[in-house]
Amino acid sequence: MAIIRMRDHLYDEIVNYAKEHLPEEACGLLAGVETEEGREIQKVYFLENKDHAEDHFTLDPRDQMNAIKDMRANELKPLGNWHSHPSSPSRPSVEDIRLAFDSKASYLILSLMAEYPVLNSFHVESGVWEKEDPRIYSVEYFF
């Protein structure tokens, strides 16, 4: 199972952004570095959901281009994307499965259906969704 790490403040930013955009799905991109231990998310991009829908999202192409330019300028690698599920579990929906095609990307899904948010991460390998191991950490407790 692939490990994908993220600082706690980045996770908090994703949760807050997703809650601010309820009842719509919130979405964005992830950038960072790849190491022998796995992936390290160093920057989260918050993009507009062009569909403004509760059950799917479309990333704004202009926002995507700006994010990619910023990644290049900061020598970060695109690692994948993230989106929220306002009222469904943190697992790929039928729509997520239909649209996912990049085996190099991580797909983080944040569920807001319960009292406490649930984050899972996946990647697609030969059309099969495989779970990753997302690890949220603070500077004091890196693992």
List the model feature ranges, each with a label:
Residues 1-78, 87-143:
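Conserved beta-strand-loop surface patch within small alpha/beta domains used
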Residues 84:
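Short, well-ordered beta-to-alpha junction loops that form the rim of enzyme active sites
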